[in-house]
């Protein structure tokens, strides 16, 4: 499905991001995964190479809240492979702090990574994609971008922003043959969800009509579809993968 494609996946060392990397590699893509630390990048690369030594995968660890570092890393990928066909903006953080305990610093932290970090990756990549005649950008949103959540207001705020960024750029970049979509997972078995208070997870899980949280592999399938030619006329979409949680 992705033979010959070059993909960059941020937040690609664990959880949904790691499964996206696996799906892309298994379907013929060359992948550069971005992680937050060298240790996590090295661990992910080791796991992937042990699974299939023939997979073409590399790793980088730019600070995603630093526009210059992100641009440098993106340009290094382009210089090595000659192009970037797919950009997946999956890196992000969650919060569950009640408003009355919230600090401006906490709010800034989640906005800086979840919103600005995506913009910093898109800006140089979109220019590359325009020059090469097109490409595909997929952002990770969330179910709470539609439903909201009762604590940690910075997180749903950031994901509402991701949706707006996705839809607006789909309209702006369509003429350059760049598709821009987002995937909005529901409760999924990731480290981020595991870090939430148990009562928060239980409350959210109770509203899943399908009766269980999602698996990272199931969410990654949506990213595979959107990156493939099967989605060649799909752009500006926020694809929910949430077991009908928002239905």
Locations of regions flagged by a protein language model:
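Conserved glycine-rich cofactor-binding loop
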Residues: 13-15
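Conserved glycine-rich Rossmann-like NAD(P)H-binding loop of the short-chain dehydrogenase/reductase
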Residues: 27-43
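Substrate-binding pocket helix/loop in short-chain dehydrogenase/reductase
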Residues: 98-99, 106-111, 193, 204
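Active-site helix of classical SDR
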Residues: 122, 158
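Alpha-helical segment proximal to the catalytic Tyr-Lys
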Residues: 127, 171-175, 232
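Residue(s) in the substrate-gating loop at a strand-loop-helix junction
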Residues: 142
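Short C-terminal tail/terminal secondary-structure segment
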Residues: 147, 224, 235-247
